[in-house]
């Protein structure tokens, strides 16, 4: 399963990797800010300079993936063909390995048959293939790590072993160093298990504290580095105020309109250089909040549009938008269909027992929340795609089982009617 998934993704890489070798804007298409930071690390400049000049330390992105890319650059060269192929191959490997937690999560809750179908669906899952083979970013590693976090959670409520809870905390902290969005759901999942242990009368306090301390232990070196570099506490990454600015401005034709990023326009780039990163982010946060205060009704509307986009892929049918996003119409059908089938599977899981459904509900409620209020990207939902796959498969197989049972009932009724008629 894993080898077939890897082979498919690597085959797609062969067609898509050349676009990352475009030298325009000093190879910006090769991993954007992550590529810049990785280059700075290789040059001995530290974790710094996410844009077009040496601008000093940064917390623009979380550290794990830039460090990984820096390792690739160190071995294969900066912005080389070999580096592009190597990092895309690693992304493909992360995506292929996600088959394992997908299979195990499905098996834990829904049995072997659902697990096999879920694993194989992940092998051929379009989002998984495309983002692994074409997108040099933390996304596929985030997907793998979050799937592992979720898998560990499913076993956590059954144990009070301190080592298991420490493992959960360490894994969650490590995953957050790759993508902080993990922390939008992991604490709530841990709290749910903690509560379940408490209700059952099992040991709960020490395991919970151990998990929290493990998160702190894993993430604190990065926090200490940030405090040393910027003189204030910055957890994981420090550009949340800027993310508000990107999605809350006078342009609503796109979910992330161009012209508001230091990589897009000279004006934003100059402001970043003049104010420094923390000053720039604070300034953009103030601009975003001022806009929101002046346009409260629009902000509510935009928030609702972002909710719809996350779950259906729909933003607009406007000519300008579809010219920018030409594949959105087929994506809307696929994304919406997947969501509907997933919700059917979630409903069936809730009928089986709320204890089964609640971890999924926690993730679906908490994970995308920050994107509703800032701005979404097409890759933001990818880390929870494994849960969509598992529940969608369970929904389809449950529907098939119900239809088969209904058909058998009808056949039995017809046979009984014929038997009664013959007796008469």
Where does each model-flagged region fall?
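Short helix- or helix-capping micro-motifs
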Residues: 5-8, 115-126, 144, 151, ...
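Membrane-interface anchor segments at the N-terminal boundary of transmembrane helices
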Residues: 81, 86, 93, 291-360
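Perimembrane helix-loop-helix junctions
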Residues: 155, 185-216, 223, 396, ...
């Amino acid at each position: 399963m894993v080898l077939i998934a890897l082979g498919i993704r690597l085959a797609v890489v062969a067609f898509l990797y050349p676009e990352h070798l475009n030298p325009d804007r000093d190879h910006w298409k090769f991993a954007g800010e992550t590529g810049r930071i990785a280059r700075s690390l290789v040059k001995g400049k530290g974790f710094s300079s996410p844009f077009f000049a040496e601008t000093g330390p940064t917390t623009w992105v979380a550290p794990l993936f830039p460090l990984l890319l820096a390792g690739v650059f160190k071995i294969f060269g900066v912005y080389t063909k070999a580096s592009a192929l190597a990092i895309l191959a690693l992304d493909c490997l992360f995506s292929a390995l996600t088959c394992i937690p997908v299979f195990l999560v499905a098996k834990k809750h829904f049995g072997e048959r659902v697990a096999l179908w879920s694993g194989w669906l992940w092998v051929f899952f379009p989002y998984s293939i495309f983002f692994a083979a074409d997108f040099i970013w933390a996304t596929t590693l985030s997907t793998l790590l979050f799937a592992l976090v979720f898998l560990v959670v499913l076993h956590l409520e059954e144990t009070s072993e301190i080592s298991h809870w420490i493992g959960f905390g360490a894994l969650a902290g490590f995953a957050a160093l790759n993508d902080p969005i993990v922390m939008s759901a992991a604490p709530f999942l841990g709290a749910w298990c903690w509560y379940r242990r408490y209700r059952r009368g099992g040991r709960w306090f020490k395991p919970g504290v151990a998990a929290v301390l493990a998160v702190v232990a894993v993430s604190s070196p990065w926090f200490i580095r940030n405090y040393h570099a910027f003189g204030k506490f910055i957890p994981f990454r420090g550009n949340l105020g800027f993310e508000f600015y990107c999605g809350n401005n006078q342009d609503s034709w796109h979910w992330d309109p161009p012209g508001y990023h230091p990589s897009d326009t000279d004006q934003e780039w100059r402001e970043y250089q003049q104010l420094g990163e923390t000053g720039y982010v604070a300034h953009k946060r103030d601009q975003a909040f001022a806009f929101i205060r002046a346009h409260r009704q629009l902000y509510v509307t935009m928030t609702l549009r972002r909710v719809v986009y996350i779950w259906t892929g729909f933003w607009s049918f406007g000519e300008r938008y579809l010219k920018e996003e030409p594949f959105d119409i087929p994506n809307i059908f696929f994304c919406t269909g997947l969501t509907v089938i997933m919700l059917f599977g979630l409903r069936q899981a809730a009928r089986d027992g709320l204890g089964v459904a609640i971890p999924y509900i926690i993730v679906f409620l908490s994970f995308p929340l920050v994107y509703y209020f800032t701005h979404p990207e097409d890759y933001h939902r990818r880390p929870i795609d494994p849960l969509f796959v598992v529940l969608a498969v369970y929904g389809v197989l449950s529907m098939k089982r119900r239809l088969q049972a209904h058909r058998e009932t009808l056949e039995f009724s017809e046979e009984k009617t014929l038997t009664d008629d013959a007796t008469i």
